[in-house]
């Protein structure tokens, strides 16, 4: 068991309230825990889908049901997409073993696929791409790494910048400038719309000029 007096800073934890089972989370964990979140604005991710695919009717949301952060993201994005007029369906899978079957089911029933920031999906982007790309179903991802593996676009944060922010928080704690018990979770301030040039070309998609190509090397 960790020592409660030692400050603990998390880095890139998507949703602290969900991860730590905090009811009514207000942005500050309290105690000896704080850190940074890699949560992109989910309403803007939904808006991105509408911007790119306004004529689509159905969106399938694929995620690992074992990851609480993923459940939070898909529930939120689903609600936002439904406000925009889409018909949405959640497609959870328990682990990598049934990722292919669930992805195939989602692909068969959806015009567009959305995948959140999800560790299991990130480890299985090849499976998602091998099913969705041949079927001509575009995937919009919650973060750049997944978009690089199987997506057409994402609203990306800089994990480097987020790490720098975490480091600055640590420095403030060590020098006594800040008390971790009252230090709110820090979020990324800048988001960049990015696209996967390889998959977009394969699907015949031309994205708006403000989208930046993902480095595929």
Task: For the regions a language model picked out, list residue spans one by one.
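Hydrophobic alpha-helical segments within soluble ligand-binding/sensing domains
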Residues: 16-56, 157-178
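Hinge/beta->alpha junction and helix N-cap segments in small-molecule ligand-binding domains
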Residues: 36-43, 63-73, 90-99, 119, ...
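Short beta-strand elements in bilobed, periplasmic/extracellular small-molecule ligand-binding domains
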Residues: 31-32, 80-96
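Flexible loop/turn connectors
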Residues: 146-198
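Conserved small/polar residues in nucleotide/adenosyl-binding loops
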Residues: 1-5
């Amino acid at each position: 068991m960790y020592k409660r007096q030692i400050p603990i800073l998390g880095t890139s934890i998507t949703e602290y309230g969900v991860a730590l089972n905090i009811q009514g989370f207000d942005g500050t964990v309290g105690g000896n825990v704080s850190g940074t979140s890699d949560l992109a604005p989910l309403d803007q991710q939904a808006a991105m889908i509408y911007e790119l695919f306004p004529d689509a009717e159905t969106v399938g949301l694929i995620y690992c049901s074992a990851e609480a952060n993923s459940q939070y993201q898909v529930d939120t994005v689903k609600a936002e997409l439904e406000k925009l007029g889409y018909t949405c369906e959640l497609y959870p899978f328990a682990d990598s073993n049934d990722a292919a079957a669930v992805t195939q089911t989602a692909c068969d029933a959806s015009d567009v696929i959305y995948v959140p920031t999800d560790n299991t999906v990130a480890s299985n982007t090849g499976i998602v791409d091998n099913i969705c790309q041949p079927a001509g179903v575009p995937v919009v991802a919650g973060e750049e790494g997944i978009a690089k593996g199987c997506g057409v676009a994402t609203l990306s944060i800089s994990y480097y910048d987020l790490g720098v922010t975490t480091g600055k928080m640590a420095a403030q704690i060590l020098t006594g400038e800040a008390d971790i018990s009252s230090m709110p979770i820090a979020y990324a301030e800048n988001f960049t719309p990015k696209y996967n040039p390889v998959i977009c070309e394969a699907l015949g998609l031309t994205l708006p000029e403000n989208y930046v190509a993902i480095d595929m090397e």
